[in-house]
Amino acid sequence: AGLYFLLNALRRLRRDADPFDPWFLAHLFLHAASLAGIEAGDPILRWANEVLEQPGASAIDRRRVRLWALEVRRWCARTARISVSEIVRRPGEVTLTRTELDVSLPLDLADIRIRRMGLDLDPGWLPWFGRVVRFHYDTSVKVGGDVP
């Protein structure tokens, strides 16, 4: 579920001269997930896979994706000494609708580094993502498997 924390990292690093679109974000998410060891068919990538299946998906500049991935990685390391993989692999539940994305994470797994960076703040409406985004910590969220 932590993959969507990258939206706040991108929001902080984004420059008006380099606008994002859903296809770019989908490729960037797939790239970050792949580097973190997340399989392409993982449910966390549902949004990215749906975007890339849409008719009219534009060709992507892979160099631009790699450059942005590097910029995010450096910012995370410099700001909080945390890897993108540690962020992306955070467990939780994701609810995705046509207009909203809600990410619920276990309260007992809240990470002070992520909190300090503001990655878990609700960004609200992100026009370049096309949805309202909210993050929640909850004691009722249960996850299994390895935790970073």
Language model regions located:
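Short, compositionally biased pre-sequence/patch detector
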Residues: A1-P148
